[in-house]
Amino acid sequence: MIITRNWLKKYLNLDNISNDQINVALNSLGFEVDNVYDLNSLNSELVLGYVEQSKQIPDTHLKLNKVNIGTKSLQIVCGASNVDVNQFVIVAPINATIANGLTLTSKKIQNYESQGMICALNEIGINQSVINKEDQLKIYNVFDKNLDLKKYLGKDVKQIIGLDDYLFEIDLTLNRSDCLASFQILKELANYFDLEIKNYDNKFNDFKENDLDLKITISKKIEEQIKTISYSNFVLNNHLNKLDSIDDIFLKLNQISSTNNLINDLSLLSTLSTAQTHILIDLDKLKSFNLKLELINHNDKELLCLTSDNQIVNIIGLQTESKFSIDNNSKNVLNIMVNIEPNLMRKQQKLLNTSNINLQRYIKPINPNLFDLANLNLTSLLNSYNLVNKAYKVKVLKQTYKNKTEFEIKISEINDLLGTNLTIDQIKSLFKKLDFKITNKNDLLTFNIDPNRIDISSKNDLCEEVARLYSYDNIQEVALSFTSFKKPKNLNLKLENKLTNYLIGLGFNNTKTYSLTTQIDAKHWNLFNISDFINLLSPLSNLRQTYRTSLSKSLIDTAIYNHSINNKELKLFEIADIYNLNQLKQRHLVFLTSHHIYKNGLTHQLVENNFYYNKEILESIFDLYNLDFSQIKYVNNLDVIKEIHLYINATIYYQKQLVGFIYQLNPKFESENKLNKTFVCEINLDVLNELKNKTIEAKTLSKFQSSSRDLTIEISNDLIYQDVLLKAISDVKYITSSKVVDLYLDDKLAKNNTKALTIQFIFNDLDHQLTEAEINTEFEKIISNVKKMKVVIR
């Protein structure tokens, strides 16, 4: 959103307010100012000129022009195709520096002395993207219906066309979509600086009763997504199809291309002010006043359109189709205003693959009941160009949205929530220039909300608005105080909820599977050595006969089913209980990953699933339970069921108690069931709850840069990695952490009952920045310790 100082000056007295103050105000009010632009400084000198003579230079595309700049006439050679006599133009005289960096000098072109330059807009700082293609190579003709431009020859043309302006480019949050109407930002600044808004009510007031019998039928498919439909109409006087330069430049400064149609351009100016879009139609071109709003298949896209007799009148978000659009001869103009569910319009924008002033407002949550304000503003703009012969009131065809405009809240509630001691008078003064009305009965405040503020829907929103206007910087920082209540504690449940949220945050899907399985599977998948199975006396099926003894098989079956329906990128987890006849109730977690763990649809970047990704998730869970990692042991088990990979598996122990298992499925089993590479981890949460460290210790973080060293070793499968690691780092200083970053297996290693591990060691210190010499000394100790264990270093 762009706001300019000159536009604000039309309504506010800014004589004592600088651009920096406006910048600070906008940021203080929560409107982040991304950029500011001082247009006046782009060009050192530009004056208004009048082309008195223009002659073609033989055998060239150039013209020799005599340009009157008031005190004298200049001879200027110009190559623009549209330069001609009787034009008011922008002239950069000799020694002037213009926005494209060119400093003008007197020089000869085709043996003719050229004493300056007649300028096009893209040469003086206007973005070429908002200049129509046919105008990009043309000089700009200055026009103003209210000025006798001959009296201004030689004067600063920047003031005449609005290039002496200062721009504020504002980033709006979604909840402040109302400020897509510049009138809303105007009110915010008036309130901030305590200024009276002038000329705001200087509007057209001679509206006639609307007797036009127009019907717009809404397709049932989209009926609930259309919030409001209304219309008005105008009878126009004869008119020139030319926008004043100051208005034309203002549109371009707002990144909007003018349409070369005066009425359409004025509607765009109105939309900037009110945020309500206008669909303008030449009434005389309509054969029927029965229109329809429906989804139409147009160019193989299902687009929301306004139609008449099965002909598209307007694709919502774009200009009216030429067959029905207004032109220089239009006398009777229909103005349709709609408000549509933003989700539908976001889909429309995606299909149209474009962005414009109308679509930018259709896709945002804006007050659906802006039609009266918008019609008034558009009519006033038309009237300022002496275009209005008759103007008619708005007729509303559909209005489902009702503004919630009133809230009651006690002053104590506001102060308690914000930590302030505001009085009723102070709160009233915060909203002095805004369209809020505040009354009170004793300490009960009644707020009548600005109907444009549809983001305020609760008391908390209202308190946030008070804080914003009061300024967060003015709210004293006070440490939180807690009142403790004696409540039964269930730390285990809290940890489980955190665990669930953690996995969901990683992209896992929470699943629920059958607790009953076959008796054979219950025995085969009895990883945790559960005894005394629970068998149903009268099972409905042999497939659902026995309570399961682990969760793994259920999740693997879920993965197999998903692969069969081509859903292969899987992250699944389940938390459930295991039972037996001896009143055992064991809480288990199982998670499964299959195929790629990361897939970027845009760049086609893929990251393959691997053991260490799953192990890292597991260790994050251990960290949640505050376990001592030095007490965790991973033991490779060669005596596993056939569905589990013989080498890529580990039985997990903590303080010598069985915690669970982590493994890859056997490639043969994966192939038989058309699974991609799949890893499974199942752990007993009851063991974690029993052995967790309830004492949370705050550790000092080093402010110095850490360094790492990698070491690759060949280790026997008979050795326990944790034991090897503890011996390796014995008496080594500055170690903050270590982890396995790679595992390698080949036929030779497998034959020797070994595997290759790459371990990464992280070094740091709390007191000083470690030198390379210190790190290398300690790393040599690790190497020495490893060699003492007769472990091969690769």
From Swiss-Prot:
What EC number(s) does the entry state? 6.1.1.20
Q: Which SUPFAM superfamilies match?
A: Anticodon-binding domain of PheRS (SSF54991), Class II aaRS and biotin synthetases (SSF55681), Nucleic acid-binding proteins (SSF50249), PheT/TilS domain (SSF56037), Putative DNA-binding domain (SSF46955)
The prosthetic group or cofactor this protein requires is: Mg(2+)
Q: Which residues form the B5 domain?
A: 402-477
Q: Supply the NCBIfam families for this chain.
A: pheT_bact, YtpR
Protein's gene: pheT
What Gene Ontology cellular component terms go with this record? phenylalanine-tRNA ligase complex
Specify the domain of life of the species encoding this protein.
Bacteria
The species this protein was found in: Mycoplasma capricolum subsp. capricolum (strain California kid / ATCC 27343 / NCTC 10154)
Q: Where is the tRNA-binding domain?
A: 40-158
Cofactor binding annotation: Binds 2 magnesium ions per tetramer.
Phylogenetic placement of the source organism: Bacteria, Bacillati, Mycoplasmatota, Mollicutes, Mycoplasmataceae
Q: Subunit composition?
A: Tetramer of two alpha and two beta subunits.
- Mind telling me what this protein is named? Phenylalanine--tRNA ligase beta subunit
PROSITE patterns, sorted:
B5, FDX_ACB, TRBD
| Domain FDX-ACB: residue ranges | 702-794
UniProt-listed GO biological process terms: phenylalanyl-tRNA aminoacylation
Name the family: Belongs to the phenylalanyl-tRNA synthetase beta subunit family. Type 1 subfamily.
